[in-house]
Amino acid sequence: MNPLIVDALAYGKGKRQATRDVIGAGSRTIAGVLESIGIEPTVAPIEQVNRREFNLSTYNLLLVTGMTSDLPTVRRIIRRWKKESKGPALIGGPIASDVEILQRVKADLAVTGEGELTLLELLSLGLNEGTIPAEGELSLVKGISYRTDNGTQVNPLRPRMSRMEYDSLTPSTHTITSYPLFRAARVYVEVLRGCSNYHRAQGSLSEETCNACDLCRSGGLESRYDCPHSLPPGCGYCSVPSLFGPPKSRSVKKIYEEVENLLREGVRRIVLSAPGFLDYGRDLQVEPEPLTDPRSPEPNYEALENLLSGLSDLAPIAEGEASLMIENLKGDLVMEKAAKILGKYLSGTQV
C-alpha cells in the first residue's frame, strides 16, 4: 500500500499571502495510525502538491485533511486525484462535518469526529489494499459518510475514545520533515483533546429552543452532558465539544516522547496544542465523571508542573536552542497559581 496524506489546512482557495508558519498535529496523527500497522505513508503539504512535486499515479490511497474554508483547495486536489489515480479519496478534519461534503468535493469517504479508530477499521475492511470496502461493510462503520447510487449515506458518530485509548496512540514524528520549513515553523503537539465548556449558547433563543433550565451551568457533571432541547455544547461557533467530547489528557510520558523525537528531527518551535491548555489534567480530578464544567475544579497544578518541567528539561529547550509555548487558554481558569506556573516555564512566549 502506498498512501498519500495531503495537509490542506488553512489553504482556502489554494494561495497563501505568507509562508506557512504553523504545522498542525492532524496529518502526523493519521500518519501514526498507518505506521502502527506497518504502513509507511507520505505526508505532503498542499503547496507542494499544487506545484506538482508528487506523481499522484504512484499512490493508491489519498487522505486529505482540511477545514471548511479549504473546500476549494480540497475539491481541486480530489479532481486531480481522480484523473491521475484509481485509488479511493478520503477526507477528514473539520471539513468532513458538512453532510454534503462528499457531493461537493466528489471524494469517496469522509471521516467525522475522532478518526483514528475509524481509519483502522476501514483499513481492516480493504482500504489497506487501495479499494473501497463494500457498501454493506461501510454501513456498519460509525463515524463515516460515503457515496451511494442514491446520494450520500451519513452513519452515526463513533463513540468517543476513552482516555486510555487516546493515550495509546502515537503520532508520527519523522514525517515532520516532509514540511520544507519545519525547522522554523510552529509545530503543534496535542496534549489533550476535547473541551470542558458544556455551557450552551443562549443569547436571545426562544423558550421553545431553550427553556432556561440552567442544567448546563448548575447541574452535575453528568447532567450537563446532554441538553433537554438538544442544543450543542460549547461556544456557538465551535464544534469541538460536539465532535470530541469533554477533555481527555495524554500522559506526560507520551507527550515527552513526541516532543523529544520532534526536537531530534530538528524542530525548534513546539506548541502544546489544546482547546484550553489549563484543562490539562483536570479530567483526572473528576474521573470517571466527564469534565463538563469549564470553571471547576481549578487547574490540576501538579499535572501542569510535571508536564512543563519535564519538557523544559529537554536539552534543546533548556539550552535555549528551542522554544516551548502553548496554543491558548480560557481566562476563567487563570488563577494566580496557574499564572505563576505559566510564567515560570513559558516566560516571554505568547498565547
Each language-model region and where it sits:
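Conserved SAM/AdoMet-binding glycine-rich loop
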Residues: 2-6, 252, 256-351
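Nucleotide-activated donor-dependent transferases that construct or modify glycoconjugates
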Residues: 2-18, 61
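Glycine-rich beta-alpha loop elements in corrinoid/cobalamin-binding modules
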Residues: 40-159
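Glycine- and acidic-residue-enriched helix-capping/strand-helix junction motifs
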Residues: 12-27, 295-302
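Hydrophobic positions in alpha-helices of CheY-like receiver
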Residues: 34, 77-81, 311
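Short helix-loop-beta junction
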Residues: 25-41, 315
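N-terminal pre-triad scaffold of radical SAM enzymes
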Residues: 20, 174-241, 256, 263, ...
